[in-house]
Amino acid sequence: MSRNSTTMIPKRIASIRFGLMDPTEIRKMSSVEVKTADTYKDDGHAYRQGLMDPHMGVIEPGLLCPTDNCKYDESPGHFGHIQLELPVIHIGFVNLIKTALKATCNSCSKILLHDADGTHPSNPGLSEQDYYRARVRDIITKHGVGSTEFSKIIKEIEKKTSEAKRTICMHCKSQQGKIVLDKPTTFKENIAAQGGGKATERKLNARDIREWLQGIPKEHLIFLGMNKENRPEWIILKVLPVPPITVRPSITLDSGDRSEDDLTHKLVDVLRINQRLRENRDAGAPQLIVEDLWELLQYHVTTYFDNQTSGIPPARHRSGRTLKTLTQRLKGKEGRFRSNLSGKRVNSVSYTHLTLPTSYAV
């Protein structure tokens, strides 16, 4: 080739940055809103806005994907989304939620660090916020966000903001409580009564937490270990992405029946409870019933992400087999990274043995 092969690459990927996704962005990239838990009709065609809607990709020869007009072996598949009736907590970010709640005010959502000049430990012309902001930026520059030093400084800030003497917010003068996490996703705030009375306990649901996190100023996100491009309230899910059908294909058995993937089974549970929750809210059901269904929705979304979460029973198939959901599909020796991407196994392999002719004297 006379032409340099590198010139044929229009862009080079310098790095990949992982972050939180805006619910609006999830809806934009979605090819269809999934509303029904049904998969296939009696005639074998997929339900429109169902979990096997062809807009999310096709897996059968002869069919074209309506989204990109490609055949099954050419279409990469497309994401859909489920609009959740009530917000739920993402199990993967529980520790970040705990840090954010402990480090910020329950009323104004500002970081519980002084912003007045003279509160800097060594420089009287600067504030406590200036001190920790400079330290965090210095550690990011020298060691990076994945370093032990970065984790230590965020823990130090959390410990500083949770001191007993900071029970009153220095910004709005509101009384602060102690944040308690009952695993896996239940948060409570214990507020000590004035004058030595009995402390009050307030349970924080996902909607309360989302409103709390929504008020955190973007210039205070650095104290939580976050950058300004991400928002902490995105940890509380209002929209659930649905993976393409190519990621969770159904299998046709010898009997002619279809066997669905474990992820599809779990998404069916999410959709059914989400629909029941919507119907009960529309019918004006008692708050107790709504809260029970809300907790059940939280359980199904949690086990969809990680079916080995401590403190709750794992989701199972009708046969009693434990479902293999997203975390189990990726992690461990049998997961995608170690088994598939780093694996050395191939479909076919051949060996050869080269030797010298016997007439050669060696």
Pin down the residues of each PLM region:
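Conserved core architecture of multi-subunit DNA-directed RNA polymerases
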Residues: 1-351, 359
